[in-house]
């Protein structure tokens, strides 16, 4: 979004001047923070940011910077989506639509980052802004007619999604335009940006559920990424987790068309239950799945959360034989304790306790958390 770009070439020059005076500024942080999310059965989990800008449209950084930012942030793939119709820096840099991709791809190779050729079709409302990924060439998208521009991308087999639907709407309440309906009916529109920067769009989320559209979360970053986000649990850039058959551009494309994605945004994961459930299950490891309880004694269950996001659980029901906390936080990257207390009425013997919870920050719909079960093998002593 253009409102995010409050600096341009001038600020980039100031930043470069600062870095020139502090040659250690980049070197101090030239390290990658891995985003540890489990693979799903049959798929690898790839971390992607598929909406960002450089000086070749209205961004404030060179394409090589976007690549190293992505590497540092633990990403696997990016798409530089410079505007087709808006090139305010044309007096200073090339107006070749493909140049930012060419530069980024060379820089990405030694870092193992996948760079997808893409562009942002930038129109007024309606139809607004749409990203086209996996383009063969960008020039044909420079059309006066909105539909012709989108069709030019679709004719190349591009994956097309609608960016920040609520951006210019009153109270940011998204409106499904007739133009979007036309693109959808034509089979061109395949996804929606449910999270743009720090903004979550519940209306777009529900549209994805109802219309079977892919969900995406992207930074739409224009300035240096460190000016907007940090590496804390709540401060990271939004990321689209793509479940691909392999680590390749072709596999990412297939996965997006198949809607295999989950969004990592702030302290939330957003997606379909079929992907959130195995992601949650794969994130956890119970250190002591077998416990003993006598009478009203307690047992402490140690649960490791191997992801960078804490899980906020609320109990849905209690099993017959034990009490469990109403709310539990399984802290990111740490081992948390769940205290179970016997009710004193359990018959002696061994059985599996099923503890039903709702994970409040794993959203399958705007107002619906993911239902899960934690299982513990308990031996009740006489």
Residue ranges and their predicted role:
Residues 29-159, 163-165, 171-173, 178-179, ...:
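A metal-dependent hydrolase metal-coordination microenvironment
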Residues 22-26:
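Sec/Tat signal peptide C-region and signal peptidase I cleavage site
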Residues 5-7, 85, 123, 376:
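Intrinsically disordered, low-complexity segments enriched in glycine/proline and serine/threonine
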Residues 27-49, 127-135, 170-382:
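Charged catalytic cores and adjacent phosphate/nucleic-acid-binding surfaces used
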Residues 1, 155, 210-211:
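Short, well-ordered loop/turn elements at secondary-structure boundaries
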